[in-house]
Amino acid sequence: MAKRDYYEVLGVSKGASSDDIKKGYRRKAKELHPDRNKDDPNAEAQFKEANEAYEVLKDADKKAAYDRYGHAAFEGGMGGGGGGRPGGGFGGGQDFSSAFSDVFDDLFGNFAGGGQRGGGNRASRGSDLRYNLQINLEDAFSGLQKTINVPTSIGCKTCNGSGAEGGSEPSSCPTCSGMGKVRAQQGFFTVERTCPTCSGLGQIIKNPCKSCQGAGRVEKDRALSVNIPAGVETGTRIRLAGEGEAGMRGGPSGDLYIFIEVAEHELFQRDGTNLFCRVPVSMAKAALGGSIEVPTIDGGRGRVQIPSGSQSGRQMRLRGKGMPALRGGSSGDMFIELAVETPVNLTSRQKELLAEFDELSENNNPESSSFFSSVKSFWDSMKG
C-alpha cells in the first residue's frame, strides 16, 4: 500500500514551520495514542505512522530530502557494493551500528522491529529555545536589565514529569522492549534508529496524566529577567542555561538563547564600536569654518571645529564617543561627516548677493576650475 504524505499525516501544510510541525505531531500523538484508542484496531498503526512522519520532518536535512524526493529518499538499497552477508563487511562480527547510525539515518529513514540495544529507559534533555529580542542603540550603549515572556514547555507538576496518572507508572515499550532503539539490517550494515513507538523513551503510558495528557510537560509562558551587557550588537547571543524546554521523564531542561537585534537609529550609524553621524552645515559655515555642536549617543553634546573651506563628506573625529567594547577595552570613536547644504527659497536680495559673490570667487573654487579645465582639454582633443 502506498505510504501517505508525511505532511498529510501530521495535518500540516508543506510550508509549515518547525513549530507548526511539532504542534501537529503533538496533536496527532495525543489523538492517536493506542492507550486512548483501545477499541480502534488501526490506532497503533496510525500512531506509528505519525511518529515516522515526525522523525523525518523535524530534521532539517531529512525534511529537505523528503521535500525533493518524497518517500524514495528513504528507501533501502541505495547503491554500494553487492553480495555481502548480513552483518559482514568489516570482519570480526563487530557492531558498527552506533558509529554509522547518524550517517545512515539520512539514507534509510525509519525501521520498525528487529533487534535492539541499550539506550532507552532514560530521561532526555529538553530542547534549546531561541528568542529574538530587539533593542534600541541607546540600550546597546548603556546595557539594561529586561524582562521577557517566553512561551515554553515546563515539567508537569501533577505527575512530576512522568506523564503517568497518580498511582500508576509507565510500562516498558513492547516494540523495543524498553531499550528505546530498534535495529534493521541494510546490506553490510546494521542500522539503529530511535523506536517509533515510544520515541526513544523505552516506555509507554497506559494511564496518561490528565494535566499533561501523558507528555510530562505543559505549555506555559514564563517571565525571565535578562541582563543585556553594554556593547551588544545585532547577532550577539546570550545563553540562559536551563531555561529552555523541560526535559522528558525528569531529564534536564534545555537552554534558552537570546539573539539580539539592534534597531536602526535616526541619527547614528554603527560600524563595530565606531559611530557615524551626518551633520548638515551651511555653505557659509563650511567656507568660513567655525565650531558646531553635535549630539552624542550618551545623550550629551560634543563640539567639533570645522576647518574653513570644508567640503561635503569631510569627517571629523570625537575620540572615545563611540560604542563600548562588549568584552572590555576602550570605546570606539564618533565620526562627524559634513553635508554642505545649498540654500533654497532665496529672496531677491540673497540672490543678488550670491551672484555678486560668484563673480568675486572665480579663483576660490579650485576643484571646479580643475574639472572644467579637464573638460575643455577633452573637447579640444575630440576636435583633433
From Swiss-Prot:
Entry superkingdom: Bacteria
Alphabetic keyword roster: Chaperone, Cytoplasm, DNA replication, Metal-binding, Repeat, Stress response, Zinc, Zinc-finger
GO process annotations (BP): chaperone cofactor-dependent protein refolding; DNA replication; protein refolding; response to heat
Cofactor: record remark: Binds 2 Zn(2+) ions per monomer.
Compartment(s) of residence: Cytoplasm
A matching Pfam family: DnaJ_C
Ranges where the J domain occurs: 5-70
Compositional bias of kind Basic and acidic residues: 31-47
GO molecular-function terms, A-Z: ATP binding; heat shock protein binding; unfolded protein binding; zinc ion binding
GO cellular component: cytoplasm
HAMAP family with a match to the protein in the record: DnaJ (MF_01152)
Job description of the protein: Participates actively in the response to hyperosmotic and heat shock by preventing the aggregation of stress-denatured proteins and by disaggregating proteins, also in an autonomous, DnaK-independent fashion. Unfolded proteins bind initially to DnaJ; upon interaction with the DnaJ-bound protein, DnaK hydrolyzes its bound ATP, resulting in the formation of a stable complex. GrpE releases ADP from DnaK; ATP binding to DnaK triggers the release of the substrate protein, thus completing the reaction cycle.
Self-association and partners: Homodimer.
Family: Belongs to the DnaJ family.
Domains: entry comment: The J domain is necessary and sufficient to stimulate DnaK ATPase activity. Zinc center 1 plays an important role in the autonomous, DnaK-independent chaperone activity of DnaJ. Zinc center 2 is essential for interaction with DnaK and for DnaJ activity.
Protein name: Chaperone protein DnaJ
Gene label: dnaJ
